[in-house]
UniProtKB/Swiss-Prot annotation:
Main location: Golgi
Database matches in PANTHER family: CALCIUM CHANNEL FLOWER HOMOLOG (PTHR13314:SF2)
Subcellular localization, as worded in the UniProt entry: Golgi apparatus membrane
Residue ranges the record marks as coiled coil: none
Name of this protein: Golgi apparatus membrane protein TVP18
Domain of life of the source: Eukaryota
Gene name per UniProt: TVP18
Amino acid sequence: MSLVEELKTRNFSIYGQWIGVLCIILCIALGIANIFHASLVIIFSIICIVQGLVVVFVEIPFLLRICPVTERFSNFIRFFNQNWPRAAFYIGMATIQYCSLIFMTTSLLVPAVFLTITSMCYALAALKHQEFTGSSTLGGAGIARQIL
């Protein structure tokens, strides 16, 4: 199934996965950009970089197969193979980034907003009783089944 066909299915978990990929880029890039602040924002930028790296494994499942990770980390990532856990995971990460606003308003607000949008996509998929579906472009369909 091509990317366009996947997007036409109106499955919000696929939308969430693609916005999650955008979150990877935003978290890593803006985490690095904000690491040069001379305030407690540095802590949140480091957390944002780590969040981006964790989301890489959550959203691109075949990386668990090719990257050497511990069994504990692998089980942690596999826990998020349903819509509700992913929605909670993303809203939790967004909340952490929203807390950075306490110290200073920075561009870390952008990952927080996109993490919230991703969470809403997964929550909508769960509320509409849509089965969690990974994008085949990102290694979802056949490859994800072999891993799990």
